[in-house]
C-alpha cells in the first residue's frame, strides 16, 4: 500500500509504473504593450529620419505540486503535539499496585502551524486540543477524516468543503525552499494580483492574522530603442 503523495517505483528506473502520479498543475498569462514612432524631415540637402520604440511585456505564472501537498499536510497537522506530556502522568493501579502509567500528548502552541489550526477548526475540533488527526484517512466520497482523541479512541469528523489550499500560509507552502507552490503575478492562492507589489512588500506585507502574504509581482521587462538616420 502507498500513502497519499507516494508513487510506485519505475520499472528498472526506466518506465513509469501503472498508477504513477501526475498531479502538477500550472497556468500562465502573457501580454505585451508596444509603441512605435517614426518621422522624417528634410533639412537642406539632408533627409533626417528619427524613430523610437517602447515595449513592455507582462508575464505571470502559477503552479502547484498537488501530490506534495499530502506530504506537507502530514508533517504539519500534528507537529505541535508530537511530544508526550511527561510532567502530568496518569497512573492506573489495581489492588494498590501500579499497573500502567499513561502520558498523553503535550500541546505546544508555539510550534502549531496555521494549517493545523485551520484544519481543526474546519473539522469542528478544538484548535488547542490534542486530537491526533490522520490526514491519510481522508475519504473523498463523504469528506470524512479519522482522528484519535486524547484517550486514543478513534472518531470521524467531516470536512464540509474538503481540503483547501487557503488553509496554508504562504510561508508553509514555501518552507525550507520547497516549492509546493510557485507564483509571480498571482498570489499564493492563484488569484491574479490587482497591483504590482514592491520588493519590500514581500518582506513586510501581512494579512489580518499576522501571516506574511509574500506577494511576488509579474515579470515586466521593458525594451526601448531609438535611432537617428541621415
Regions found by a protein language model. Name each.
Residues 48, 59-61:
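Intrinsically disordered, low-complexity acidic/polar segments
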Residues 43, 54-58:
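Transmembrane beta-strands of outer-membrane beta-barrel pores
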Residues 30, 43-44:
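Outer-membrane beta-barrel channels and translocator barrels
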Residues 35-41, 226-230:
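Residues on the lipid-exposed face of transmembrane beta-strands in outer-membrane beta-barrel proteins
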Residues 1-24, 64-226:
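Feature marks flexible
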Residues 30-32, 223:
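Membrane-spanning beta-strands of outer-membrane beta-barrel proteins
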Residues 25-29, 38:
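A cross-kingdom feature that marks long, compositionally biased intrinsically disordered regions
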Amino acid at each position: 500500500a502507498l500513502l497519499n503523495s507516494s508513487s510506485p517505483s519505475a520499472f528498472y528506473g526506466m518506465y513509469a509504473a501503472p498508477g504513477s502520479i501526475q498531479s502538477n498543475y500550472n497556468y500562465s498569462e502573457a501580454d505585451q504593450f508596444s509603441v512605435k514612432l517614426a518621422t522624417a524631415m528634410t533639412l537642406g540637402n539632408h533627409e533626417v529620419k528619427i524613430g523610437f520604440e517602447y515595449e513592455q511585456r507582462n508575464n505571470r505564472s502559477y503552479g502547484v505540486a498537488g501530490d506534495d501537498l499530502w506530504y506537507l499536510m502530514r508533517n504539519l497537522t500534528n507537529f505541535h503535539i508530537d511530544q508526550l506530556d511527561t510532567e502530568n502522568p496518569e497512573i492506573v493501579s489495581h489492588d494498590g499496585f501500579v499497573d500502567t502509567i499513561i502520558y498523553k500528548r503535550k500541546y505546544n502552541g508555539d510550534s502549531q502551524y496555521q494549517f493545523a489550526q485551520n484544519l481543526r477548526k474546519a473539522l469542528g475540533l478544538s484548535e488547542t486540543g490534542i486530537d491526533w488527526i490522520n490526514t491519510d484517512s481522508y475519504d473523498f466520497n463523504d469528506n470524512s477524516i479519522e482522528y484519535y482523541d486524547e484517550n486514543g479512541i478513534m472518531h470521524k469528523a467531516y470536512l464540509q468543503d474538503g481540503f483547501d489550499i487557503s488553509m496554508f500560509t504562504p510561508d508553509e507552502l514555501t518552507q525550507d525552499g520547497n516549492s509546493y507552490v510557485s507564483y509571480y503575478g498571482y498570489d499564493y492562492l492563484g488569484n491574479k494580483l490587482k497591483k504590482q507589489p514592491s520588493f519590500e512588500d514581500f518582506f513586510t506585507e501581512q494579512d489580518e492574522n499576522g501571516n506574511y502574504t509574500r506577494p511576488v509581482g509579474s515579470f515586466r521587462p521593458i525594451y526601448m530603442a531609438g535611432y537617428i538616420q541621415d
